[in-house]
């Protein structure tokens, strides 16, 4: 027994989740009547639902309050690329939804009262009202729009406080993140329960939906990595971008695929920037910053799963509303940094725009965790490799302009 326990401790989370998916699948086929197994999935989703609003608030306050001013001029273009790249990734995900519309199988017996918006005007009205919600109520009711707004305000107000107090803020954010790590560490058990419930209630054919979901997610990320990002690079440098793109994917993306953490991949990216001969004064700032705000993969995940939920409930949205979703997803994705599965925890932010309740949104998050073995790895690979790519093309564009 001790050998089995030690082997389990040494096994990385990706393999554990894969094992959980397989066990849940087998139990759902062989023992569909043992419904108690499904409670494990409910507990896992419940724990995520409880900590997610506090996590978003703590991380955003910490990031804004510690943001430094006086960046050198070259950073301006890099930041613009980070934000533009994230928005374009979200927009590509919207287009992918129109080309390959997905639906999800959810338990709609739980709090299914939906209030779909009537076009862009009502969406803005709902957004503005949620912005001014009581901050305590926003945390308690999982009003993520309000949580983000108040976190931004508190972060800006705390920028001028003494460094000792900022350290306390960072400690609070670290503690909250650690709690999430503990919850994520039991993800294999929770996902086993989720897979069991899905298979036992809907049959084995339900897995074909997840296969299509994975294909759309990964396909969209590949399109951004191999078409959208190289196009941005070509527009700025007027050079063939693919040697640099493939170098970043090979040396940065491959490592990030397995670590599943942009923050953990920072040392790899710094070394790659040095190997590429980039300015140290620039990449020492841009790479850590990119790990926080360059979240194209996260924006794709948020939009694909949110729009799948929208399709599931038959909510009709116009293109302007979908465009607003891209903006919200891009902004929300910036809060996903440094947290395993962080993009999934921010799906309720986007779902709330369409009147989808928190309970149903967390079921969508549960679906995300089921496919997360592949989704999170590909997402991190895209995010982290793009940090180096945008840093490099910004510097190339800077020198090109200077020579001209």
Curated annotation (Swiss-Prot):
Keyword Membrane assigned: yes
GO CC annotations, alphabetized: plasma membrane
SUPFAM superfamilies: Proton glutamate symport protein
GO terms of biological process kind: serine transport; threonine transport
GO molecular function: neutral L-amino acid:sodium symporter activity
Catalytic activity: L-serine(in) + Na(+)(in) = L-serine(out) + Na(+)(out); L-threonine(in) + Na(+)(in) = L-threonine(out) + Na(+)(out)
Entry's localization field: Cell membrane
Mode of membrane association: Multi-pass membrane protein
InterPro entries linked: Na-dicarboxylate_symporter, Na:dicarbo_symporter_sf, Ser_Thr_transp_SstT
UniProt keyword annotations, A-Z: Amino-acid transport, Cell membrane, Membrane, Symport, Transmembrane, Transmembrane helix, Transport
Annotated transmembrane regions: 17-37, 44-64, 75-95, 138-158, 179-199, 212-232, 287-307, 319-339, 354-374
Domain of life of the source: Bacteria
Claim: Transmembrane helix is one of the keywords in the record: yes
Function of the molecule: Involved in the import of serine and threonine into the cell, with the concomitant import of sodium (symport system).
HAMAP family: Ser_Thr_transp_SstT
UniProt family annotation: Belongs to the dicarboxylate/amino acid:cation symporter (DAACS) (TC 2.A.23) family.
PANTHER family named among the record's database cross-references: PROTON/GLUTAMATE-ASPARTATE SYMPORTER, SERINE_THREONINE TRANSPORTER SSTT
The protein, known as: Serine/threonine transporter SstT
Organism: Streptococcus equi subsp. zooepidemicus (strain H70)
């Amino acid at each position: 027994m001790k050998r089995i326990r030690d082997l389990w401790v040494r096994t990385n989370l990706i393999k554990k989740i894969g094992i959980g998916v397989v066990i849940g699948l087998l139990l759902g086929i062989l023992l569909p009547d043992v419904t108690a197994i499904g409670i494990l999935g409910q507990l896992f989703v419940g724990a995520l639902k409880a900590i997610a609003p506090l996590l978003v608030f703590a991380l955003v306050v910490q990031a804004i309050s510690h943001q430094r001013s006086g960046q050198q001029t070259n950073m301006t273009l890099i930041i613009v690329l980070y934000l533009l790249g994230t928005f374009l990734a979200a927009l590509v995900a919207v287009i992918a939804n129109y080309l390959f519309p997905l639906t999800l199988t959810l338990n709609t017996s739980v709090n299914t009262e939906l209030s779909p918006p009537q076009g862009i005007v009502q969406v803005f009205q709902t957004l503005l009202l949620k912005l001014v919600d009581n901050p305590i109520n926003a945390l308690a009711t999982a009003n993520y729009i309000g949580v983000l707004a108040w976190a931004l305000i508190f972060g800006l107000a705390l920028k001028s406080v003494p460094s000792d107090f900022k350290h306390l803020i960072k400690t609070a954010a670290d503690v909250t993140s650690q709690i999430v790590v503990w919850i994520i560490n039991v993800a294999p058990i929770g996902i086993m329960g989720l897979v069991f419930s899905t298979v036992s209630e809907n049959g084995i054919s339900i897995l074909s939906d997840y296969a299509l979901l994975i294909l759309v997610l990964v396909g969209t990320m590949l399109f951004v990595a191999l078409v959208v990002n190289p196009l941005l690079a070509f527009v700025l440098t007027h050079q063939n971008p693919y040697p640099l793109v493939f170098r970043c994917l090979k040396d940065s993306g491959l490592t990030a695929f397995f670590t599943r953490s942009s923050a953990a991949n920072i040392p790899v990216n710094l070394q790659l920037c040095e190997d590429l001969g980039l300015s140290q004064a620039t990449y020492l700032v841009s790479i850590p910053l990119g790990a926080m705000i360059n979240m194209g993969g996260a924006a794709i995940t948020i939009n694909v799963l949110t729009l799948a939920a929208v399709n599931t409930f038959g909510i009709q949205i116009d293109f302007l509303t979908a465009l607003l979703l891209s903006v919200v997803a891009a902004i929300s994705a910036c809060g996903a940094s440094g947290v395993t599965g962080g993009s999934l925890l921010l799906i309720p932010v986007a779902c709330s725009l369409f009147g989808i309740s928190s309970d149903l949104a967390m079921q969508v998050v549960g679906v995300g965790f089921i496919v997360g073995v592949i989704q999170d790895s590909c997402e991190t690979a895209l995010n982290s490799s793009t940090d180096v790519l945008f840093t490099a093309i910004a510097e190339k564009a800077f020198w090109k302009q200077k020579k001209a």
